[in-house]
């Protein structure tokens, strides 16, 4: 099996490690974490090899595959920066799709996308690069999920919903059909979205309404 290195050593990385082991496609050689104090730690038996400076030497040593094991909620633009840096170094950023996920055969999936257990993604849907569809989420037919966006556990998207780049649909939120959510927006947990959400807007409630502050 080809070796793969993970970026991040927290809870998100744990889930990706488990998915990759279940699928049996890669040899998990280690993790990279920006906190130098994590050197030598283990996450589900996978060692932390060092900080970001190790990536270039790993690539030179023949490691060509990486997975993203971080997904910031507070600073979603950081997710884009991490992805672009890893790709610029030359790594193939692998997808992680849990074997229990129900993904229609024609769903388009970008690079570095993670699809967790118990999810349903229906026909005609497109997932961009570095997307997270978290545990138990439902993405119905003909949705478009932009790069670096996250669909949180238990969120439900009806048909033909568009989620822009870097946006987050929170835990248990519901989005009705044909809604458009702009770039770098945030839908709070449990919200019911019945109107379009502009870019860089936070909404919450039932029905969802704009919150007073905007994400950074």
Residue ranges and their predicted role:
Residues 29, 64, 165:
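Conserved acidic residues
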Residues 95-211:
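Structural signal for interior beta-strand "rungs" in well-ordered beta-sheet cores
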Residues 1-43, 56-59:
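Hydrophobic, well-ordered beta-alpha structural blocks that scaffold small-molecule cofactor pockets
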Residues 37-98, 102:
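Phosphate-bearing ligand-interacting subdomains
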Residues 23-25, 87-91, 195:
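Short helix-capping segments at alpha-helix termini
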Residues 12, 71-74, 209:
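Short glycine-rich anion-binding loops that position phosphate/pyrophosphate groups of nucleotides
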Residues 14, 18, 77, 195, ...:
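Alpha-helical elements of the RecA-like P-loop NTPase motor core of helicases
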